[in-house]
Amino acid sequence: MSAQSLPAATPPTLKPPRIIRPRPPSRHRAPHSPGPLHNGSSPKALPQISNDASASVCTSIFWEPPTASLKPPALLPPSVSRTSLDSQTSPDSPSSTPSPSPVSRRSISPEPAPCSPVPPPKPSGSSRTPLPSGPTPLQDGSASAPGTVRRLAGKFEWGAEGKAQSSDSLERCSQGSTEVNGEKETPEAALSGNGSQENGTPDAALACPPCCPCVCHVAKPGLELRWVPVGSSEDILRIPCRASPLRASRSRINPPVISHPPVVLTSYRSTAERKLLPPLKPPKPTKVRQDISTSEELPQPDLKLPSEDGIQTATKAWEGDRPEGAPLNAPPVALEGREEEGLDGLKGLQWELPLQDEPLYQTYRAAVLSEELWGVGEDGGPSPANPGEAPTFSRLPGPRNTLWQELPAVRGSGLLESLSPQERRMQESLFEVVTSEASYLRSLRLLTDTFVLSQALRDTLTPRDHHTLFSNVQRVQSVSERFLGTLLSRVRSSPHITDLCDVVHAHAVGPFFVYVDYVRNQQYQEETYSRLMDTNVRFSAELRRLQSLPKCERLPLPSFLLLPFQRITRLRMLLQNILSQTEEGSSRQENAQKALGAVSKIIERCSAEVGRMKQTEELIRLTQRLRFHKVKALPLVSWSRRLELQGELTELGCRRGGVLFTSRPRFTPLCLLLFSDLLLITQPKSGQRLQVLDYAHRSLVQAQQVPDPSGPPTFRLSLLSNHQGRPTHRLLQAASLSDMQRWLGAFPTPGPLPCSPDTIYEDCECSQELCSEPSTPSKTEGQSLESKAPRKHLHKNPEGWLKGLPGAFPAQLVCEVTGEHERRKHLRQHQKLLEAVGPSSGTPDTPQP
C-alpha cells in the first residue's frame, strides 16, 4: 500500500480515522458506457489531487454510487444537479466543509433517524469523486435561502425549506447504508441519532451531513454533535418540528427539495441536557368553574335531566377560576362551541355527567357528621341571626355534595330572590335526598366494579366465601339506580322541587325490602372478612392492592360493605328533617309522614334481623360448647329461640358419710342458661366446656326465695318435669342480691294480679286457640277471625275476652288446642296441690346449709 492512500497524521489527542481499504472492481466499466458521475467531474481530474490534503484535518474519501442506487433525474432535487455539483469539486474547500460522522458496522435501526440526503461513500476500484464541500447553489445560479434551526423551550424550529428537506432526508436515510468489504454498513448519525430528539420527536433539521472518517466528527461518550445550517435566520418562517421517522411512508414519493442548505459542526452537547428539559405535552382544556359569590348574575343554561328510564341529573356548573381573558358573563367553556349533536349525545349519558363530581358516600357522611359536630346547619351553612334574613351557605373544606342553590337553572330562574328563607331550606333538604343518593350509588358502583367483579379477587376466594362477603349488593345497587332515576325525573320537571317524599314512600313499601336481606347477613360478613384477613394471605394481598387504587381513595372494604345500612338510616334522618319543616295539614306533611313510617319499619326490621342473626350465631357457638353426658341430646339451634339470661350459681347439697361421720354441706358450681322457651342446668368443665345436667321447659320452672337474713341470698329452683319427666328441686345460692332478683323475676308465678281478676300468661306458657267460628270486626273490636286460624293469647279477663296476638277476641269463638300446653298446665296444678298439702305428700325437704 502506498503512502498516498494513507490518511494524514493526527495529533495524539485525536482518534485516528478508520482506514477503509478499497476493493478491486468485479468488472471493468465499458468505455462507451461510463455511467453518470455523481458530481459531474471528469475522471481525468482525479489524479491531479495533490498530497497537500494530508496536511488538512479532514481527509477526502472518493466514492462513486452504484448505478442501481441512483434515482432518475426527475426525482433528484435541483440542488444536487450536475451544474451545482461541478462547482464544488475543487479540492481547496474552506474550513467549513461539512464533516460527516464516522461510519460503523452496526445493524440498521428499526427506526431510521434523520440523516443527510447525500448518499454515503462507497469505496471501490472505479473512479473516485470527492464529496461536495461548498454551498449548494440553485439551478439558476443564485444562492439558496439557507434554513435555520432554533432551539426554543426544548423544541427545534426551522424554515419551510428545512421542513421539506427533513421529510426528504427521512426517506433517503433508510437507503444511506453502504457496503464495505461485503458487509452492510450504516452511518453513525443514522444509528446514534446525532440530531437530538425531544419528547420522542427527532430533530430532522439537525441531521448530520455526509459521513466522513475525520476526527472532528468522532462521537464521544455522553456527548452528541450539534449541527447548525449556515446563513441568516431572519427570512425563515419558524414551524414546530413534529415530524417522526415512523410516519414517513416509503411507498409515498416525497416532493422535490428546492435547496439543501449546508450545515457545519459547531460544538458538542452533553446528553444530560435532554433530561433537564421538561417534556412537551399538548395543552389540556381548562375547566372553568364559577364562583358562588359572583355567579348569581350570570345567565345559566336550563336544567337538563333525563327521563324516568335514564339516570341523568341536572347540569352542574364547574367550580374554579376562569381562564385569563374570559369575560365574566361568558358561559362555561365546556358548553362553548358544542353543536346540537354533542348536546343530544350528552343527554343520553347517565347520571355521572352532571353528578360526576359528587364525593363518595363515606366522604359525604364524614362531612355531615363534622357539620353536626361543629354546629353547622342542616341546610349546608350556619343559621342566620335574623330569621327573615336569607341564610348564607358556607362550605367546609374538602369534597362536598352539590347544593340546590348551585344549580345553573336555579340561578337563571331567579328563584333565589323570590323564595323565602324557609322555602329555600326546604329545597336544600329535598335536594340533599338526590345528591346523597347519587353519592351512595357512586360508592356502590365502585364496590361492584372494583371488588365484586374483580376476577383476581374472586380467584382467591371460594364461591361460598365470595357470596357471604358481598351478599346481594348488586341487587341493592339496581334498586338504588331505579330510585335515583325516579327522583331525577321529578327534579327534571321544574327547578322548584314540589315534593319527593311520595317517591320515597313508593320505593320504601316495595323495592327497599332488599335492604333487609342484605343487612341480615351483616354478622356473617364481619366474621368472614376477619377470618379471611387472618388466614388467606392471597386475599389480603390482593385486597390491599385494590384498596390502594386512586379511585378507592384508600378506603377499606368494610366501609363499602356497611353502606346499605348507613344509607337507610341516613334516609330516615333526612325525612325527619323534611317533616320538621313542612306546614301543618299540607300534602308535604302527609307524604313525609308516610315515607318516614315506611322507612322506619324497614330499619326496625333490619335491626331485628341483625339481632336474630347474632342470636343464631350465639346459639351455634354455645352448642359447640355443650356436652350432653348421660342426658338425652337436645337440638338447641332454632330460629325462634334466643338466649335471655346466663349466670353462674352455686348449688348447696349434703354429702353423706359413713357411721363415724355426719353429713356435711357440699358446694357445686353450676351455670344456668335461660332461653326463651328452655332452661338448661350445666356444670362448667375444662376448656370452656359445659356439661348438661338437666333441662326443662321454661313454663315448668318455678323459683322461690328462701328466707335467711344471715346467710347469702338463696332461692329454691323447682323443675316440675325435667328431661326424664320427673320433678326435681335444687337449692341455689347467688353471688349478690341483685343476681337472685334477676332469676326470681325470670320465673314469675302465673295467676291473677293483686289488683285485677285478669290472668296474665307468659309468652312461653300462653296457650294456642283455634278459631271455630268466623267473626266480623264488629264482634271482635276491630280484629277479624277466620275459620281454623290459630291465635295466641296472653291476657284473659273474667268477661270472656282474650287479648293476645294480634288483638282481642271473644273466648266463645275459639277452642284451646290440647296437647303439650294442657299437660304442663295439669303438672302445675298438681304441684300447687302438693304444696298445699305439705311435706307429707312426699316432697323431699330442702337441706339446710
Swiss-Prot record:
PTM notes: Phosphorylated on tyrosine residues upon EFNA1 stimulation. EPHB2-dependent phosphorylation at Tyr-361 triggers UBE3A-mediated ubiquitination. Ubiquitinated; UBE3A-mediated ubiquitination and degradation by the proteasome promotes EFNB1-dependent synapse formation.
An example Gene Ontology CC term for this record: dendrite
Subcellular location per the Swiss-Prot or TrEMBL entry: Cell projection, Dendrite
Residues of the DH domain: 425-609
Pfam families listed in its UniProt record: RhoGEF
Disruption phenotype: Significant decrease in RHOA activation in brain extracts.
PTM annotation (Phosphotyrosine): residues: 361
One GO biological process term: retina vasculature morphogenesis in camera-type eye
Tissues/organs with expression: At P12, expressed is detected in the CA1 region and the dentate gyrus of the hippocampus.
Region (Disordered): 1-146, 159-202, 277-308, 771-803, 819-849
Compositionally biased region (Low complexity): 65-110
This protein's UniProt keywords: Cell projection, GTPase activation, Guanine-nucleotide releasing factor, Phosphoprotein, Ubl conjugation
UniProt-listed SUPFAM superfamilies: DBL homology domain (DH-domain), PH domain-like
Cross-referenced InterPro entries: DBL_dom_sf, DH_dom, Ephexin-like, PH-like_dom_sf, PH_ephexin
Main localisation: other
Comp. bias regions, Pro residues: 111-123
Post-translational modification Phosphoserine, affected residues: 107, 109
MF GO annotations: GTPase activator activity; guanyl-nucleotide exchange factor activity
Function (record text): Specific GEF for RhoA activation. Does not activate RAC1 or CDC42. Regulates vascular smooth muscle contractility. Negatively regulates excitatory synapse development by suppressing the synapse-promoting activity of EPHB2.
Further remark: In a mouse model of Angelman syndrome where Ube3a levels are reduced, levels of Arhgef15 are significantly increased and ubiquitination is reduced compared to wild-type litter mates.
Assembly notes: Interacts with EPHA4. Interacts with EPHB2.
Name of the protein described by the UniProt record: Rho guanine nucleotide exchange factor 15
Provenance organism: Mus musculus (Mouse)
This protein's encoding gene: Arhgef15
